[in-house]
Design a protein with these regions (language model features):
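Single conserved hydrophobic/aromatic residue that forms the stacking wall/gate
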Residues: 1-12
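Metal-coordinating catalytic core of metallo-dependent amide/deamination hydrolases
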Residues: 23-167
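Conserved, mostly hydrophobic/aromatic
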Residues: 41, 98, 128, 177, ...
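Histidine/acidic-residue-rich catalytic or RNA/ligand-binding cores of hydrolases
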Residues: 60, 133-145, 171-179, 195-204, ...
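Glycine-enriched alpha-helix->loop->beta-strand junction motifs that scaffold or abut catalytic
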Residues: 115-124, 156-159, 176-185, 206-211, ...
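Short, acidic/turn-prone active-site loops that include or flank metal/cofactor-
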Residues: 131, 188-193, 216-219
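His/Asp/Glu-enriched, well-ordered alpha-helical/loop segment
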Residues: 149, 153-160, 202-263
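Catalytic beta/alpha-barrel core
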Residues: 161-169, 187-190, 214
Length: 263
């Protein structure tokens, strides 16, 4: 928490994975780890939205978690309870939403069950999606659709949804997300560290999709550097300069990126 504050981050959303003891046994208070994060944020004065993560399997073709992932396990009921507990706790600067790790880590019926409990409540809903091409290939194999196309068709995406990474897309998916009002969260340092690839930044900006910056695995914790490398990565990928600039709208690259990131 403190490194985030030092890195000029004043308000963050935390994908909260770590729920249980080593080995997967629950704590006496099932929200123990959520309280630890929330209290750290309150102590440092950092605005925090805790996003308990639905995580139940190791992959689209794997029905269970690996032993080293059991600390992350959570049912839809459990995730909904954690969200409600944190939101009702009254801690200063602390709110709560929910997260679905990814289509590969949560089965469709479980996603449906969690969203049914969320209903129309005004809370953020995050999901990692289309981060790597292997995920896209697996999703095509198991569902017949690309990840963002599946999400847009299967669920009523709206402005509460934030699609984290959204690295590998086709125009039809970008159009569907734009129509829904959902946003994307690009995480340049993590995507670079993991070799994920480059999001189609010109297309996302051109479609008017709301964009935020994320650190995801906390490889970097300084948002100005994340913003810088968002543009630099695009320049390297496309072999051109001022990728984010829009001469007819906002000719200054930095200004357009900053406007997009803070809207």
């Amino acid at each position: 928490i403190m490194p985030s504050l030092v890195g000029s981050e004043m308000c963050i959303r935390d994908s909260h994975y770590l729920h249980h003891q080593p080995g997967g046994q629950p704590y006496a208070d099932e929200a123990t780890m959520a309280w630890a994060v929330a209290d750290a944020a309150a102590d440092t004065g950092l605005g925090l939205t805790v996003l308990p993560v639905l995580y139940e399997r190791a992959g689209l073709a794997q029905a269970a978690l690996r032993p080293d992932q059991r600390r992350f396990a959570g049912t839809p009921d459990f995730i909904a309870r954690l969200q409600a507990s944190v939101q009702a706790s009254g801690r200063p600067l602390v709110n709560a939403g929910v997260a679905i790790h990814s289509l590969r880590a949560a089965a469709s019926p479980s996603i449906d069950a969690l969203l049914a409990q969320v209903g129309d409540a005004a809370m953020p809903i995050h999901i990692h999606v289309a981060e790597q091409m292997q995920e896209v290939r697996d999703c095509l194999t198991h569902t017949g659709q690309r990840p963002m196309a599946w999400l847009a068709q299967r669920h009523a995406l709206d402005a509460r949804w934030q699609l984290v990474h959204a690295t590998h897309s086709v125009p039809e998916e970008i159009e569907a997300v734009a129509r829904s009002g959902a946003g994307i969260v690009i995480c340049p340092s993590t995507e670079g560290n993991l070799g994920d690839g480059f999001a189609d930044l010109p297309a996302w900006l051109g479609a008017g999709v709301p964009m935020a910056l994320g650190s995801d695995s906390h490889v970097g914790r300084q948002w100005p550097e994340e913003l810088r490398w968002l543009e630099y990565g695009q320049r390297l990928h496309l072999q051109q300069r001022n990728v984010a600039a829009a001469p007819a709208q906002q000719p200054a690259t930095a200004a357009r990126l900053l406007d997009a990131a803070v809207q």
